[in-house]
Amino acid sequence: MAKQRPSSKRWLREHHNDPYVQQARREGYRSRAAYKLMELQEVVKEDGKSLLLIPVGANVVELGAAPGGWTQVAVKLAGVEGSVVGIDLLAMDPVPGAEILVGDFLDDAMLAQLQGLLHEGRVDVVLSDMAPNMCGVKSADQLRGEALAEAAFQFVEENLKTGGNFAVKLFNGPGFHDMVKQARAMFTVVKVVKPDSSRSRSPEHYLVGMGFKG
């Protein structure tokens, strides 16, 4: 049997002891990432009040939905009056209250299937917590992460309603500031944050855009 590398052992130990992992297990969430979306929900403030990323009744599309932690939270936030569609290349277990589609979200056939579920054309909220399969080479991992974020931006430009909201994972890299600049041109309010529930050594940040200009 192959021995685990020290880095793998350290990750497993930290994962097991992670308070967010333990809380997710207690509360029935599929991943600790659920708490990141909870933090992003009210991260934008205006005149001392929180602007909700996912308003009650919103039609939400989540890109890269597996394993479903964000999907579970989105269903709760949108409520029975809203709708949630999760899309991923990987099959995942059903999430009560959500529709799950398997495929490439930029594929024409997938977009046609999505439109059939929405009935209203464009959507109110787009979410993306997508991350690449890490190869361990920093520059390559950064480029892969940027490619996923760019695909999410493309989906937003083609499918988000005017006035809609967007949350996307970004990684520190050569294209980070250009993406933030792009978002500021697309949205009325833009905020970049690192949630408390994000691991401190992770290079990930989240961009929240409110009020899509269309």
From Swiss-Prot:
Catalytic activity annotation: uridine(2552) in 23S rRNA + S-adenosyl-L-methionine = 2'-O-methyluridine(2552) in 23S rRNA + S-adenosyl-L-homocysteine + H(+)
Residues binding S-adenosyl-L-methionine: G68, W70, D88, D104, D129
UniProt cross-references to Pfam families, sorted A to Z: FtsJ
Entry GO terms, CC: cytoplasm
Gene3D superfamilies listed in its UniProt record: Vaccinia Virus protein VP39
Principal cellular location given in the protein's record: cytoplasm
Cellular compartments annotated: Cytoplasm
Keyword tags: Cytoplasm, Methyltransferase, rRNA processing, S-adenosyl-L-methionine, Transferase
Residues at the catalytic site: K169
InterPro entries: RNA_methyltr_RlmE, RNA_MeTrfase_FtsJ_dom, rRNA-MeTfrase_E, SAM-dependent_MTases_sf
MF (Gene Ontology): rRNA (uridine-2'-O-)-methyltransferase activity
EC number: 2.1.1.166
Role summary: Specifically methylates the uridine in position 2552 of 23S rRNA at the 2'-O position of the ribose in the fully assembled 50S ribosomal subunit.
Recorded family membership: Belongs to the class I-like SAM-binding methyltransferase superfamily. RNA methyltransferase RlmE family.
Protein name: Ribosomal RNA large subunit methyltransferase E
Organism expressing this protein natively: Magnetococcus marinus (strain ATCC BAA-1437 / JCM 17883 / MC-1)
